[in-house]
Amino acid sequence: MELLHSINDFNEAKQVIAGGVNSPVRAFKSVKGTPPFILKGKGAYLYDVDNNHYIDFVQSWGPLIFGHADEEIEENIINVLKKGTSFGAPTELETTLAKEIISCYEGLDKVRLVNSGTEATMSAIRLARAYSQKDDLIKFEGCYHGHSDSLLVKAGSGCATFGSPSSLGVPNDFSKHTLVARYNDLNSTEECFKKGDVGCVIIEPIAGNMGLVPAQKEFLLGLKALCEKYQAVLILDEVMSGFRASLSGSQEFYGVVPDLVTFGKVIGAGLPLACFGGRAEIMDLLSPIGGVYQAGTLSGNPLAVCAGLSALYKIKRDKTLYTRLNALAVRLTQGLQKSAQNYNIALETLNMGSMFGFFFNENAVRDFDDALKSDTEMFAKFHQKMLFKGVYLACSSFETGFICEPMTEEMIDLAISKADESFDEIINGV
């Protein structure tokens, strides 16, 4: 396999695009490689400009639960496209999508559509502060909630990839109201409550940006109780886990009903769309009926709404979808685990529905500190080996992988066999 055209394309991109990419992790910096420049995707496969193809376990970082270029979703988008791309005015499709989302999640009365997960979390926090009339926010080490200033504090994912706990350009005044607790640690969390006047707490119930690290059930239930005790708004960030881990996101596993929730990725099916929502008494504080301002030129645009609605309709029709995706994820993670054991390589694997993760780590990962103990050099070697064998994995050990509906057991078994070859070559210095 060669990447000559991709190398040339990347060099050209770096002349006109900052860093050569429009989102930092895509640069392959942490795996010391060159990113393949993608020509097209179809089903479970990606095709690059060098005529290579890959089994794609990234799926655009999660949105594509039905894989690339799904015919039904594409056809629906094209039909809507013929009527216009954006109107800046209400449409019936928006209301229909809102109803579909609300029907899947307990405690959700109303939603507001936005364009990105960052917008969703930023707006939810503003709303929560207005409702609680308290400024301080608790977040958790390793949880990523987008790149708004107050949330770029020990944010995992891209920050962990580049060895930085925060970001330049964020004034201290922006983050002084952000208190950081340890994930899966109630004592650490209550200490934060005692330190400040906490108005809201935001958490990924299934963290996907320090690798895949699910909350322990007793921790999430305890967090809900602490929020009630201290009269703070609980925000579950399900931008990644919503409609991915299950139809009801984390609620299938934990049964926790938040005050506010954020969704993204799957609800846009690959187009820019996210939302935040919650109890009516909180949501009704939003402008134009309340005093909390939030707006967006392209919010609820018909193309993205149509794509998301098409995906949700397909999900709801397919009663065994999540069972099949989970089975494939289990098959993959167990296969990787067994292969690593054959070469005495320390590897921890897990999945939550169609989300999966693995760490080159001797012990189970419960929080960000555990994740940082992983062997990132081993991950970089493994990633490059797999890439050149036609398996496209997330290019950071602090990211999550995804299964899509077009994948088959044969594809999973092929990926496992390529992992076995990769481990053999790494151990033998090939």
UniProtKB/Swiss-Prot annotation:
Residues with N6-(pyridoxal phosphate)lysine modification: 265
Keywords for this protein: Cytoplasm, Isomerase, Porphyrin biosynthesis, Pyridoxal phosphate
GO CC annotation: cytoplasm
Needed cofactors: pyridoxal 5'-phosphate
Record's catalysed reaction(s): (S)-4-amino-5-oxopentanoate = 5-aminolevulinate
Gene Ontology process terms (BP): protoporphyrinogen IX biosynthetic process
EC code: 5.4.3.8
Superkingdom of the source species: Bacteria
Keyword Cytoplasm: yes
Single GO MF descriptor: transaminase activity
Signal peptide segment: none
Entries under CDD domains matching the protein: OAT_like
InterPro entries: 4pyrrol_synth_GluAld_NH2Trfase (IPR004639), Aminotrans_3 (IPR005814), Aminotrans_3_PPA_site (IPR049704), PyrdxlP-dep_Trfase (IPR015424), PyrdxlP-dep_Trfase_major (IPR015421), PyrdxlP-dep_Trfase_small (IPR015422)
UniProt pathway: Porphyrin-containing compound metabolism; protoporphyrin-IX biosynthesis; 5-aminolevulinate from L-glutamyl-tRNA(Glu): step 2/2
Compartments reported by the entry: Cytoplasm
Quaternary structure note: Homodimer.
Family note: Belongs to the class-III pyridoxal-phosphate-dependent aminotransferase family. HemL subfamily.
Name of the protein described by the UniProt record: Glutamate-1-semialdehyde 2,1-aminomutase
Record organism: Helicobacter pylori (strain J99 / ATCC 700824)
